[in-house]
Every structure is written in structure tokens, then in C-alpha cells.
């Protein structure tokens, strides 16, 4: 398939209110729209219709019956929200395991008679394995299914928490912290995969915001919970708390978590072959009827992907992803460094008790929660508004080409088909607000560092901490949503790649924090990190300007490769058939 034959058709025609709302195909990235399908739109909510085309490739030889096409997902809004709660509850233990540990850093330091650098190592190794594990497990989730990997991850985490509660030496804590991180961290990436499996682009931003918001409750209240438990029952109680919570989570996941991977269950109506992918909940007649399990829609199954544990390394070559990795990674690492520094400063500079240190993490956590939930809702609103404007503009351009230039409708269609400027700019829609949030958070972190240096009142330190956190995690929601849009069939792998980069950077920054603070002071450290964050935002200008063209070019190459592979496979099958006939 030649490159000049692969481009997007226009988003044209009005929604027929008498027809059923049809969900847009949101599977593997494709590069064509059939003109016959342009008048088939979707409706994302009861109040406002967002119109999108049905995507298909010319390689499809059979014309689909769009009017009777199965929905993109059989999971309705209530079931999707139930999935969000289930995934968020699981992911909560990943975010909480880090935050709940911060208030007891000084306690661990005294308990095992170690230095500040050594106690920070227990945080560093957690971030390292939190980054590496999803990179490997994300590929498994994209190949074997979401459910088996989640069950394995929670089981490992459950065992590691029990081990940490019983640890007797510093070495045991370091090793078990590695195991704890490796166990639970993949669920964050897998949660993105689950949401990508059951949602369309128009609604995805909101669901990503919801699940991120619920997950960040661990960061918001983890330190408070850890401080309360430690001050009453000692530092070991925080790991018993995590063990009990993750044990309950494991039971719920075994019973209720469905498989959503589209190569295994399609739109949710296909029963998985492997029993490990089947949730006992699906045995109930009401659930079976809702998901159409007795009348499976096999046409919604997507091609299986080959298992590759190193798949994230290939994703790193994608320009859009590499730019997002740098920007989001540095921002997250700065926020994590500030979280670690806050515990040390409150204990040594302000001489606060463990319980009061936990309370001082509330502004950070609550502002982070507000940041993530608000940014997700903003993405949904922005998508609907920009898409509606784009459709109106496209209609105007079509009329201009017809009336002012004298082109026929067929000629106009060919012009629109072959000009990238007529394609809806999804990259700009997701990232246009990133600069403001990055600059505001950077200024907040710089002010936070200098408040510590000048020994400002505690309220000033906490206000700056909350202000920086209010904007620092917006880029994570923007980046995660765009990555899911770009790689809808490899969401766990792609988000695992993002997680790897941001966690390794966090480990590097936290590992250097103590020595940097000694030589540069905290004001100098966070001025440096703030400048680094602002500098990392510069490549976003390039992405906003050229992202649409880069994405389209990559899609065309991928479609050409798939078409070539398909033709080779067809020729091989035809040759084998002739050889069989000759026998």
C-alpha cells in the first residue's frame, strides 16, 4: 500500500438522531476513513454529541454493516465506573506504599543505626524497581491479558508486606522493598491498559482522571496514615496495614476483576479460553446478559500481539513518546524529591513528631488529588470543544474549495484526503495546557526550597508544597491520556515505559538529594530542578507544532508494513494451497 494512498478523510456530515449511537473503532491506529462511513458518529453523553468517523482500512475487503455494528465496548457506564473503582483500589497500594513510608524515615534511621543516605536508599530502590517491573510486566499484560498479571502482582505485594512487617535487619528491608515495588507497580500501567480497552478517545480523559485521582489518594493520605499507625503501634504496623489491605484487594480481584484485553475478549462479549482470565463474577446471569457472553461478537476481537518483554525499548524510538518521557519524567522526579526532602526537613529543621509530619503531608496530597481529577475532566471538556470547532471549520473549508476554487465534490474530497492539515490535531488537544502547569509547578518548587533555606514559618513551606503539587501532576494525566491514544492496543507497554523513565529519574534525584543539599542547600537544589523542569518543557513546542504530521507519517509506515506482511502471508498461503492441490 503506497504512502500517498493512506491518509485520513474529513470529519464531515451530521449525526442522524434517529439512528443508534455507534462507538468509534478505537483499536490499533489506522490511517484511513471510508467516505461511506463519514456520517456515522458517536455520542459520548446525554447532553452533548461528539461526532467522529468510523475508522477502517482499505485492506478490509468486507463492507461492515455499520447500523448493526456491535458497540466498541459492552461495558456500560456503570460497569466502567465499577472497573475504575476496582483498578483504583488496586493501584492505591502502589501510591500508598511510597507515601506511607515517608514519615518513618527518621524512625528507620534511628532503629537500625544508619545514616540519612542509607535510609534514602530504601526509597531509591523502591523507585528503581517501581520503574523496571512495569516495563517487563506490561508486555505480559498486553499478550497474556490484564487479569492474570494483576493477580500475580497483588500476590507478590501481599507477601512482601508481610515480610517487611517481620524484617529484623536493614538488608532485609532493602530487599523486601525491592520485591514490594516490583510486585505492585505494574498495576498502574495495567490500569491504563484496562481503561484503554473499554473507553473511546472522547471519554478516555475523564476516566483516566478518575482512576488517577482515586489512586493518588494513597499519596494524599498515605503519609497521614503512616504517621498515625507508627506513632501508635510502631513502624511495623504500616506494613501490616498494607498486607491486610492488599489481601482484601486480592480477594476482590480474584472474584470480580474481568479480563478486558481486546485480543482475548473483544468488546467484552467473548468468553476467554484460559480459565485464569475468567472472573467468577461472569457466571451470574445478569452479567452474562449485559456483556452478551451467550452471543459473543467475535468480529470485535483484535489480532494477538507477540510476547516481547523488551517492547518498551522499541516504543522509545517513537518521537512523541520520547518527548513526553523526558518532560513528564523530570516533573514527577522533582515532585518525588520534594516529598522525600519534606520528611527530613520537618524532622530535623522543625523538630516535629512523626504524627505531625504526617499531618504536614496533607496539603501536598490533597492538592495532588485536585490536580489529577481536575486535569482529567478538563481533557474531556477540551476534546469535545475542540472537536466540535474542528468539524465546523472543516465544513467551511469544504465550501470554500467548492465555491471559490470551482472544485467538484470529488476533487475536494481528494484534496482533504491528502492534506494533513485537515486532520483533527489530537496532540494539541491533549497538550496545549501543559506549559502553564509546568511553569507554575516549577516556580512553586523553587519557592519551596528557598522557604526551607531561610527557615520561613512552617505554614509558608506547606503552602508552597501544596501550590507546586497542585500543578505538578497535570502533565502526567496529559501524557498518559495521549500515550493511550497513540498506542490503544499496547497501553500497558507504553505507560510502563513512561513509568520506567519517571521512576528511574526519581531514584537518581533522591539518591543525590542528601549530597546536593549539603553542597547547594535546598534552595539551590530546587532552583536547579525547577530550571530543569522548565527546560524539559521546550521540546513540547516542537511536538505541538509537528506532532500531527509525525503521528500520521508513522501510522502510514506501520500500515504499509502490515499490508506488506499480509500480502506475503497471502502469497505463502496461496502457494501452499497450490502445492497441496498438486499432490
Swiss-Prot record:
Q: Tell me the keywords, alphabetical order.
A: Cell membrane, Glycoprotein, Membrane, Transmembrane, Transmembrane helix, Transport
Recorded phenotype for the gene knockout or disruption: Leads to intracellular accumulation of clotrimazole.
Task: Name one molecular function that GO assigns to this entry.
Answer: xenobiotic transmembrane transporter activity
CC per GO annotation: plasma membrane
Principal localization?
membrane
What Pfam families does the entry give? MFS_1 (PF07690)
Tell me where the transmembrane regions lie.
88-108, 121-141, 148-168, 178-198, 208-228, 238-258, 323-342, 354-374, 432-452, 458-478, 493-513, 524-544
As for membrane topology, the entry says: Multi-pass membrane protein
Keyword Magnesium carried by entry: no
Q: Which residues are glycosylated?
A: 60, 120, 267, 380
Protein's GO biological process:
xenobiotic detoxification by transmembrane export across the plasma membrane
- Report if keyword Transmembrane is assigned: yes
Region of interest: Disordered: 23-46
InterPro entries according to UniProt: MFS (IPR011701), MFS_dom (IPR020846), MFS_trans_sf (IPR036259), Sugar_transporter_CS (IPR005829)
Concerning PANTHER family, the annotation shows: MAJOR FACILITATOR SUPERFAMILY, QUINIDINE RESISTANCE PROTEIN 1-RELATED
Q: What does this protein's UniProt record list under function?
A: Multidrug resistance transporter involved in resistance to the antifungal drugs miconazole, tioconazole, clotrimazole, and ketoconazole; as well as to quinidine. Decreases the intracellular accumulation of clotrimazole in and plays a role in the extrusion of this antifungal from preloaded cells.
Q: Which family does it belong to?
A: Belongs to the major facilitator superfamily. CAR1 family.
Write the protein's name. Multidrug transporter QDR2
Q: Which organism is it from?
A: Candida glabrata (strain ATCC 2001 / BCRC 20586 / JCM 3761 / NBRC 0622 / NRRL Y-65 / CBS 138)
Name of the gene encoding the protein in the UniProt record: QDR2
Amino acid at each position: 500500500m503506497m504512502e500517498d494512498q493512506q491518509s485520513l478523510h474529513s470529519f464531515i456530515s451530521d449525526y442522524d438522531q434517529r439512528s443508534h449511537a455507534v462507538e468509534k473503532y478505537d483499536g490499533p491506529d489506522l490511517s484511513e476513513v471510508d467516505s461511506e462511513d463519514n456520517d456515522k458518529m458517536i455520542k459520548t453523553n446525554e447532553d452533548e454529541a461528539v461526532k467522529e468517523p468510523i475508522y477502517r482500512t482499505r485492506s478490509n475487503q468486507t463492507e461492515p454493516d455499520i447500523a448493526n455494528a456491535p458497540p466498541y465496548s459492552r461495558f456500560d457506564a456503570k460497569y466502567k465506573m465499577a472497573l475504575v473503582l476496582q483498578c483504583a483500589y488496586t493501584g492505591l497500594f502502589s501510591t500508598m506504599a511510597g507515601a506511607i513510608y515517608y514519615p518513618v524515615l527518621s524512625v528507620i534511621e534511628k532503629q537500625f543505626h544508619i545514616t540519612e543516605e542509607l535510609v534514602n536508599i530504601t526509597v531509591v530502590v523502591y523507585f528503581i524497581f517501581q520503574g523496571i517491573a512495569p516495563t517487563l510486566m506490561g508486555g505480559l499484560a498486553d499478550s497474556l491479558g490484564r487479569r492474570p498479571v494483576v493477580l500475580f502482582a497483588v500476590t507478590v505485594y501481599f507477601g512482601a508486606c508481610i515480610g517487611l512487617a517481620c524484617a529484623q535487619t536493614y538488608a532485609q528491608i532493602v530487599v523486601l522493598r525491592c520485591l514490594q515495588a516490583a510486585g505492585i507497580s505494574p498495576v498502574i500501567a495495567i490500569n491504563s491498559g484496562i481503561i484503554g480497552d473499554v473507553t473511546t478517545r472522547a471519554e478516555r480523559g475523564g476516566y483516566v482522571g478518575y482512576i488517577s485521582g482515586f489512586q493518588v489518594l494513597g499519596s494524599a493520605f498515605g503519609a497521614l496514615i503512616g504517621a498515625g499507625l507508627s506513632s501508635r503501634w510502631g513502624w511495623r504496623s504500616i506494613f501490616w496495614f498494607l498486607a491486610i489491605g492488599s489481601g482484601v484487594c486480592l480477594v476482590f480481584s480474584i472474584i470480580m476483576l474481568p479480563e478486558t484485553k481486546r485480543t482475548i475478549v473483544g468488546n467484552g462479549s467473548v468468553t476467554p479460553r484460559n480459565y485464569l482470565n475468567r472472573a467468577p463474577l461472569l457466571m451470574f446471569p445478569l452479567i452474562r446478559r449485559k456483556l452478551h457472553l451467550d452471543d459473543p461478537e467475535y468480529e470485535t476481537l483484535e489480532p494477538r500481539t507477540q510476547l516481547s518483554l523488551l517492547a518498551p525499548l522499541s516504543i522509545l524510538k517513537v518521537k512523541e513518546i520520547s518527548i513526553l518521557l523526558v518532560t513528564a519524567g523530570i516533573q514527577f522526579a522533582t515532585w518525588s524529591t520534594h516529598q522525600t526532602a519534606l520528611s527530613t526537613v520537618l524532622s530535623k529543621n522543625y523538630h516535629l513528631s512523626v504524627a505531625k509530619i504526617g499531618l504536614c503531608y496533607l496539603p501536598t496530597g490533597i492538592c495532588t488529588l485536585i490536580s489529577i481529577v481536575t486535569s482529567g475532566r478538563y481533557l474531556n471538556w477540551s476534546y469535545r470543544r475542540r472537536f466540535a470547532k474542528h468539524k465546523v471549520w472543516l465544513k467551511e473549508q469544504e465550501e470554500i474549495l467548492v465555491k471559490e476554487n470551482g472544485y467538484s465534490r470529488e476533487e475536494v474530497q481528494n484534496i482533504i484526503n491528502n492534506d494533513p492539515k485537515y486532520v483533527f490535531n489530537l496532540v494539541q488537544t491533549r497538550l496545549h495546557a501543559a506549559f502553564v502547569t509546568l511553569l507554575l509547578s516549577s516556580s512553586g518548587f523553587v519557592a519551596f526550597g528557598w522557604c526551607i533555606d531561610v527557615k520561613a514559618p512552617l505554614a509558608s513551606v506547606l503552602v508552597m508544597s501544596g501550590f507546586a503539587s497542585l500543578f505538578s501532576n497535570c502533565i502526567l494525566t496529559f501524557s498518559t491520556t495521549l500515550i493511550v491514544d497513540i498506542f490503544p492496543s499496547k497501553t500497558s507497554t507504553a505507560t510502563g515505559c513512561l513509568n520506567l523513565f519517571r521512576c528511574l529519574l526519581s531514584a537518581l534525584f533522591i539518591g543525590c538529594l542528601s549530597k546536593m543539599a549539603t553542597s547547594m542547600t535546598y534552595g539551590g537544589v530546587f532552583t536547579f530542578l525547577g530550571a530543569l523542569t522548565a527546560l524539559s518543557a521546550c521540546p513540547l513546542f516542537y511536538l505541538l507544532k509537528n506532532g500531527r504530521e509525525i503521528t500520521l507519517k508513522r501510522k502510514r509506515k506501520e500500515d504499509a508494513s502490515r499490508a506488506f506482511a499480509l500480502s506475503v502471508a497471502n502469497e505463502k498461503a496461496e502457494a501452499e494451497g497450490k502445492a497441496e492441490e498438486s499432490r
